[in-house]
């Protein structure tokens, strides 16, 4: 199976990318995957996810992983995870009750339905641009009605979020990253300087 890890980088997060991209490269080299660092503004990367279809022309599976996420267990190949569904897989988030999913770590198989979802997200921007978390919120709504293209993996399956904001978002459901988890994703840590420091710390705890 051919697999590519795709991460979005840009000049305004160069310091963050310099910290996290080597972690992703190490993981890909270990498991025979390709690493794609797509250099484009974040807003464009979010709006034009249909461009991922070009990578699906070459790879059987894409793992899209945010720049501010790192792999904390190098031993596990993503394509062997039992929770990965037949088309598109995303994890539950666990930070706040109104946001079910976190799209910072997603797996896309090369299927007609996965490609169609990517096209729909980009072509129907008006459906999600005003939502609280953009098309992440849209996918949460689709998951709630049970669309077969989307598989929702359990909390922390391959995306363990970390947060210090909002202050009232307590870890009441066990969503926070824990020792032994696969991915550390401090998407809710602010300001960005603090997020960087947290990442530096966690990179000393990576299991190999």
Task: Annotate the PLM regions.
Residues 1, 59-61, 149, 180:
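Short coil/turn segments at beta-strand junctions that form active-site/ligand-binding loops
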Residues 1-59, 112, 190-191, 207-208:
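N-terminal anchoring/stem segment of glycosyltransferases
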Residues 2, 32-33, 67, 86, ...:
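Loop/turn elements at helix/coil->beta-strand transitions in domains of secreted/extracellular proteins
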Residues 5, 28, 68, 106, ...:
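A residue-level signal for conserved active-site and pocket-lining positions in enzyme catalytic cores
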Residues 6, 36, 63-65, 89-90, ...:
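Hydrophobic/aromatic beta-strand patches that form the interior of the parallel beta-sheet core
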Residues 8, 92-93, 109, 186-189:
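Structured loops at beta-to-helix junctions and adjacent beta-edge loops in soluble globular domains
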Residues 41-118:
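GT-A fold catalytic core of metal-dependent nucleotide-sugar glycosyltransferases
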Residues 45-46, 50, 112-208:
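Catalytic core and acceptor-binding pocket of nucleotide-sugar-dependent glycosyltransferases
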């Amino acid at each position: 199976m051919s697999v590519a890890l795709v991460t979005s980088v840009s000049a305004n997060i160069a310091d963050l990318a310099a910290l996290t991209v080597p972690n992703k490269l190490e993981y890909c080299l270990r498991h025979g995957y390709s690493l794609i660092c797509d250099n484009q503004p974040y807003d464009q990367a979010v709006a034009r996810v249909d461009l991922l279809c070009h990578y699906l022309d070459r790879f059987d599976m894409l793992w899209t992983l945010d720049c501010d996420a790192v792999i904390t267990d190098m031993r596990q190949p993503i394509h062997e995870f039992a929770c990965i569904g037949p088309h598109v897989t995303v994890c539950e988030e666990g930070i706040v009750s109104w946001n079910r999913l976190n799209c910072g770590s997603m797996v896309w198989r090369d299927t007609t339905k996965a490609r169609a979802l990517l096209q729909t997200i980009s072509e129907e921007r008006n459906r999600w641009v005003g939502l609280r978390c953009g098309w992440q919120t849209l996918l949460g709504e689709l998951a709630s009605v049970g669309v077969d293209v989307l598989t929702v993996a359990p909390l922390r399956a391959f995306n363990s979020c970390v947060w210090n904001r909002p202050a009232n978002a307590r870890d009441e459901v066990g969503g926070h990253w824990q020792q032994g988890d696969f991915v550390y994703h401090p998407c809710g840590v602010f300001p960005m300087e603090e997020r960087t420091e947290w990442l530096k710390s966690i990179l000393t705890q990576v299991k190999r």
